[in-house]
Amino acid sequence: MSDFIVEKLTKSVGDKTVFKDISFIIHDLDRIGLIGVNGTGKTTLLDVLSGVSGFDGDVSPFSAKNDYQIGYLTQDPDFDDSKTVLDTVLSSDLKEIQLIREYELLMLNYSEDKQARLERVMAEMDSLQAWEIESQVKTVLSKLGIQDLSTPVGELSGGLRRRVQLAQVLLGNHNLLLLDEPTNHLDIATIEWLTLFLKNSKKTVLFITHDRYFLDALSTRIFELDRAGLTEYQGNYQDYVRLKAEQDERDAALLHKKEQLYKQELAWMRRQPQARATKQQARINRFHDLKKEVSGGVAETDLTMNFETSRIGKKVIEFQDVSFAYENKPILQDFNLLVQAKDRIGIVGDNGVGKSTLLNLIAGSLEPTAGQVVIGETVRIAYFSQQIEGLDESKRVINYLQEVAEEVKTSGGSTTSIAELLEQFLFPRSTHGALIEKLSGGEKKRLYLLKLLLEKPNVLLLDEPTNDLDIATLTVLENFLQGFAGPVLTVSHDRYFLDKVATKILAFEDGKIR
């Protein structure tokens, strides 16, 4: 298989250059993790590579692209909603897949008058040795929790639609998989299965993920997008962390030297008369270039969050013999739990077992079927749910936060302006006046999280907070939660995040909470 070569790829969206003259090579059987702060163009790069979006210029930057059949897992699947799950998953034009689809349809709607046709299909499957593929189809569907194959995809939840698209991509006749956040809406066991499946698939993979264990286990190389450029690192995520730290040390040392030189040149500039000789112009030009480099700072922004919180009393949250049922299905039964001020509770379990229900009962958006949830009088809850609520996308970024506060008081007593806070949280000044609707999905979640924290909560409820957040933001969030004065309850499938944040685990298993 030829290498997929990309040379001097440039892409602009409106007046923003997303990436400029980036070049890289994708080798056969590579598994490349694509990382970068939200808004740097990770999804845009996958769009361009897949052909969903175009590139700048008239000359193609791609070599040997036609050797690759690309399967693309997007964040928002575009399906024919009238088609069934079976027809959607098995949409490949591969003969074996077509036979499997026909076989499954006959088995779903079996009658005696279809027996002869069924036998004919089975004989063809025998001749093409398609039963191994059929077994793989069954395994993929089972592992992803896709059961009712006759349901129209238009009737599925967002999470199930994503799993259907993931199955479609995994089972398609592709040799290059572009996967945008493949672990979203998957539980831990399914993520572990997916890791092994991709490792054994003999396919080339380029993927975006916030799940650092998944990234570490799967990747053989890391591509990092930053400030319209792309940097490559050999190895997995742990290798990237080590190599990046070494590079940051070199960058810091170089910046220090430039700052010292800038001070010397600034003193020289101040000593010179306004009408400078032409022969000095080259030195003057170098001074202005140096000024730009020094004012740009180091490559990585040091993100910090240290917000003042409201006081919390001894009584926080208590579940007293709480039961809850949904459509006659018991979710909680005589459940008791005392949440104390310093608790860091991770909530885990399969999809649909009631993890989010627990948070909704605390938030008051659901009422128990029996028992009661007692909330302390001083409790002030911030609920970071999977669906962003109350985010008026017609507003401008800085105005959205200034409606809550003009400045932020930290736990140390100092104050920070909203503009400075936005910069610390990776919103450059150029974005402060932008409409929220122009932000990426991850940037919107980051902005929403900032708003919640500005409201000075003393209890945090987090429902899958790592979805759509970049790794840099997750690191800051983890550090913030470790220093947060009140209790934190978080539903998450992100094992790395839970290991860093949670000191207790509530596990939904076999209809019980352990």
Task: Annotate each language-model stretch with its function.
Residues T301:
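Phosphate-sensing "switch" segment of ASCE/P-loop ATPases
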Residues L243-R276, Q280-R286, L290-G297:
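Intracellular alpha-helical coupling/juxtamembrane segments of multi-pass membrane proteins
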Residues M1-L255, M305, T309-R514:
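ABC ATP-binding cassette signature C-motif
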